[in-house]
Swiss-Prot record:
Pfam families: Aminotran_1_2. It comes from Picosynechococcus sp. (strain ATCC 27264 / PCC 7002 / PR-6). Pyridoxal 5'-phosphate binds at residues 72, 108-109, 132, 187, 218, 246-248, 257, 292. PANTHER family: AMINOTRANSFERASE (PTHR43144). This is LL-diaminopimelate aminotransferase.
Length: 410
């Protein structure tokens, strides 16, 4: 008899974004001419930077030339890209990260799930609430949780609320946890963490022998110079943290696929036999076995991000989306919405009006305004009564969406 991984049966309904798509498609089936504007899923809309396109075009020519053709590349990524990442994203900010500690991949989403391959099932796990659903769902799939309760919380997980009631600060848990997921700038709330706040987490992790999974996919949107871009800016973080980054949002690589994970070589855990085990070695083994690397063409495009032209072009992209976020904040606040985030992050977190549930507000915006956002409850129980609006869209669409919403709620 064939057995399935029955942990999948514990997953609550559909993954958040497919459920949004189901509702939108149902509405469009009845209203095929509705001018839908999507400010929900965090997908970019603006073209790839010219520097990246030109580098990829040249790489395509390389693939057509026997002398420059590339077959299988290093599973960890080409050295020339890893060296650029180390120099520009870490060493330039005072972080002692070596190129060999960087693993290039096809997405931070994939890596935050795949990293569980090198950890056992008996770890205690902490996530913020609300939270990027992938952190929770991948742990459910891997058998690290119990069943979900009526609020959607899974047994075996420690939930750390980040809401307006605590100024969106992730409080250190009173109990000991082994694996900690942190994402700053935060998805979905748009909240940021100060150096002092992150240092407290690093100190907690070192004291308790914990590992922090730090998702910095949105660090490029930080404009406040006092805020850390990497957890490795904090003292001791190399001893307790793995960081995930992506080219998806800063360089528009959502459809091109390139990211990277940093696993410091001095990061160790103790095996059941008392032996200290290097996590870098485990992750390197995992990637070498299960991953064939990102394509040469895409990696050349990612390398171009670090050129002088590339840096200028991605700054233009980031500024564009941040201005969209500023417009969303300003327009919604003008008609009385309580609005958070959207300053050092591309997401605006909105309190739903008149006591509406997150999904009721979703339906109201869809039906009355033909605008799609993301229900806060889809990110966890503490997200109920909130709504995420993404700045990733054209200026024209953002302005039109705000016009529709402010007209409906003024």
């Amino acid at each position: 008899m064939v057995r399935i991984n029955e942990n999948y049966l514990k997953l609550k309904a559909g993954y958040l974004f497919p459920e949004i798509a189901r509702r939108v498609n149902g509405f469009l089936a009845e209203n095929p001419n509705a001018p839908i504007i999507k400010l929900g899923i965090g997908d970019v809309t603006e073209p790839l930077p010219a520097a990246c396109r030109e580098a990829m075009a040249k790489a395509i020519d390389d693939m057509g030339d026997r002398a420059n053709f590339k077959g299988y590349g290093p599973e960890q990524g080409y050295a020339w890209l890893r060296e650029k990442i180390a120099a520009h994203d870490f060493q330039a900010r005072g972080c002692d990260i070596d190129a060999s500690e960087i693993f290039v991949s096809d997405g931070a989403k994939c890596d935050t799930g795949n990293i569980l391959d090198i950890f056992g099932k008996d770890n205690t796990i902490a996530v913020t609430d609300p939270v990027y659903p992938v952190y929770v769902d991948t742990n459910v799939m891997a058998g690290h949780t119990g069943e979900a309760d009526e609020s959607g919380k899974y047994g075996g997980l420690t939930y750390i609320p980040i809401t307006a009631d605590n100024d969106f600060v992730a409080q250190i848990p009173t109990e000991k946890v082994d694996l900690i997921y942190l994402c700053f700038p935060n998805n979905p709330t748009g909240a940021t963490a100060t150096k002092e706040q992150l240092q407290a987490w690093v100190d907690y992790a070192k004291t308790n022998g914990s590992i922090i999974f730090f998702d910095a996919a949105y660090e490029a949107f930080i404009t406040d110079e006092s805020l850390p871009h990497s957890i490795y800016e904090l003292e001791g973080a190399k001893d307790c943290a793995i960081e995930f980054r992506s080219f998806s949002k800063n360089a528009g690589f959502t459809g091109t696929r390139c990211a990277f994970t940093v696993v410091p070589k001095n990061l160790t855990v103790t095996a059941s036999n008392g032996q200290a085990v290097q996590l870098w070695s485990l992750w390197n083994r995992r990637q070498s076995t299960k991953f064939n690397g990102v394509s040469y063409i895409v990696q050349r495009g990612a390398e171009a991000v670090y050129s002088e032209a590339g840096q200028a072009q991605i700054k233009t992209l980031i500024d564009f989306y941040l201005e969209n976020a500023a417009i969303i904040r300003r327009e919604l606040q003008a008609v009385g919405f309580d609005v958070y985030g959207g300053v050092n992050a591309p997401y605006v977190w909105v309190k739903t009006p008149a006591g509406l549930s997150s999904w009721d507000f979703f339906d109201k915006l869809l039906i009355n305004c033909n605008v799609v956002g993301t229900p806060g409850s889809g990110f966890g129980a503490a997200g109920e009564g909130y709504f995420r609006i993404s700045a990733f869209n054209s200026r024209e669409n953002v302005l039109e969406a705000m016009k529709r919403i402010t007209t409906a709620f003024q």
